[in-house]
């Protein structure tokens, strides 16, 4: 039985995610306990084949509008709310899966999944984007130097359900409003959110490999 990881391909940086997952499969196939495959997802028929879904960075407003206008929103909503499925939202994807937005909330109809409040464009305009070396070794073994790229990135301003949502990583400092810069979190063991772009870490698949091992394979084996 093959475990299928889908990458939502309505808009955004989906090809980079596909390539990183493909690289994980090629380099680590002997260490994964299940056979894996990856595919792009543009409609409900493709989504129905998936065990996990990565929602990429891009433009959350465009993503939301495309899903609604094509009649895909309800299928996405049902998928991500299914506890047997795994969901990972990166940057715009994190915005799209969150329950609340603190700004520009009328522009995005979210999937109302991750129990947090998110601030869009917390790092300013694209010219202010940057790559920061982050120590993720508290949750990814030996990953103390990951190049995390933030592009007009959101942050989690508030965790609405601390019982089920675990903060994985905060950047040093605070935003202009005095809020902590929470940039990675998980909900239970099947929902992951990152405000940065692990798929833009060239030739570095550590984050995707961890996602596959800790979310996809563990959830599938239940």
Curated annotation (Swiss-Prot):
Q: Which UniProt keywords apply?
A: Glutamine amidotransferase, Hydrolase, Lyase, Pyridoxal phosphate
Instruction: Kindly list the positions annotated as binding L-glutamine.
Output: 58-60, 120, 151-152
Q: Which residues form the active site?
A: 91, 197, 199
The Swiss-Prot or TrEMBL record annotates one GO molecular function as: pyridoxal 5'-phosphate synthase (glutamine hydrolysing) activity
Q: Which InterPro entries match?
A: Class_I_gatase-like, PdxT/SNO, PdxT/SNO_CS
Which pathway does this chain act in? Answer: Cofactor biosynthesis; pyridoxal 5'-phosphate biosynthesis
- The membrane-spanning stretches of this chain are none
Keyword Ribosomal protein attributed: no
Gene Ontology cellular-component terms for this entry are:
cytosol; glutaminase complex
Q: What is its EC number?
A: 4.3.3.6, 3.5.1.2
Return the SUPFAM superfamilies for the record.
Answer: Class I glutamine amidotransferase-like
What does the sequence similarity comment in the record state about its family?
Answer: Belongs to the glutaminase PdxT/SNO family.
What this protein is reported to do is described as: Catalyzes the hydrolysis of glutamine to glutamate and ammonia as part of the biosynthesis of pyridoxal 5'-phosphate. The resulting ammonia molecule is channeled to the active site of a SNZ isoform.
**Official protein name in the record:** Probable pyridoxal 5'-phosphate synthase subunit SNO2
Q: Which organism is it from?
A: Saccharomyces cerevisiae (strain ATCC 204508 / S288c)
